[in-house]
Amino acid sequence: MRDFVELLGLEHRPSKGKRTSIWNGNEIIFEESNWEILSFIKLIYRYGVQPFSLIRYVTSIINNFEKIYHLQDNGEVFTNISSLLLSMNPEFPKLLEKSIKSEILNLGYSEKLINELVKTTLVVNYGQDTNVHSFVGFVSLAGAGFNLWSVKGGNKKVPEHLIYRNKHVNVVPSHVIKIINILNNGTQNLYEVHYHNQDSTNIMKATYDIVILAIPLIHNQEFPITFEGFPNNDFFSPAKYHETIATFVKADLKPHYFGLEAELDNILSCDPNRTIISSLGRLNSVEGSMKNSNVWKIFSNKPLKSNIINEMFSNVQEIKQITWKAYPEYSTKIHEAKFKLHNALYHVNAIEWIASAMEMSAIGGRNVALLAHRDFFRKFCFEKIIQTSSLKKKLPTEL
């Protein structure tokens, strides 16, 4: 993502330090101070030096993970998530089979640290518990212990500019409803894509050599796609995506509801069954921080009822809720997601079964681009060899 931002000439969004607290439904169990040194002292008082030891361990995992950039620079490609993880570290695929709780317990960390700090990162980032597989757990921890950044004007500017600045890309705003595998001259696979444009029910058709899917393949997705003519027409995952509700509220926060004396910028939950919400945070402009913003973003696993919102806020002016299937329901049940579904049919979102994040999507997208490029040119070169060979055989006869 950093390379994309630099390539496109975009800017990092300025941010100010935000104070964060962890809430268990009864009380605030940890609250950051305005002074960093006091926050460290509070952290050590409650958890000892284990948080810092865990950050070092997560850093070692990130260092191994970063090998993927060198591999992709050298044109390495991967057809499934296990081979991608294996290329970074032989131990990484095993992390998909162990829960983050059992993995961290085996490393010698306390239940208290796991049930409060580790669980908080998972609740906030994925709306899930410590029974998720270890790799996504470490990705979640990486997001908590390292400097994160965003793009000025909104992170969506990265894909928008990558698409619209490329004059060779033709964007067709439409919904794809069906993909049919057809054979051309009995040898070459082509894909017939059926779609209808926005605000229209007329079915359109187009044929492509390569099709890349950048959507979750689940049975209950909002805009389902059917597949026909493939050896196996069911490319859908047996697992599910986690449904998350984002609620935006323009109002004044009631600190006492959370056991606070004054407002904080972020309130994170370590027990969503008791807190109802996963997190609550002050929402700033995508152009930069707004002083004293009274717009709040709340994540929860269920829609918030108006009485709950009124208990948390006063002077409520506006409420907006958005529900979406945000990321997979992670577990230790092995799901061998594939980047290559058929000869020239590819799936970017396979990488989400490792972990869902913008950087992961960028890596998955690049892998599929490299994979499609390699496959196409292998086929193209092979066809050229066949044509040249046939021509050489015919030449003597024609002479």
Give the residues covered by each predicted segment.
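Short, well-ordered alpha-helix to beta-strand connector turns
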Residues: 166, 208-209, 342
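Active-site/ligand-binding neighborhood in enzyme catalytic cores
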Residues: 59-192, 197-199
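Eukaryotic N-terminal low-complexity, Ser/Thr- and Lys/Arg-rich leader segments
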Residues: 49-52, 63-77, 87, 91, ...
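Mid-domain catalytic core of redox enzymes
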Residues: 178-316
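Hydrophobic/aromatic beta-strand patches that form the interior of the parallel beta-sheet core
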Residues: 172, 212, 247, 346-348
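Dinucleotide-binding Rossmann-like beta1-alpha1 core, especially the glycine-rich loop
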Residues: 1-71
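Conserved flavin/dinucleotide-binding core of flavoenzymes
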Residues: 275-399
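General small-molecule cofactor/ligand-binding pocket signal
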Residues: 13-15, 170-172, 322, 346
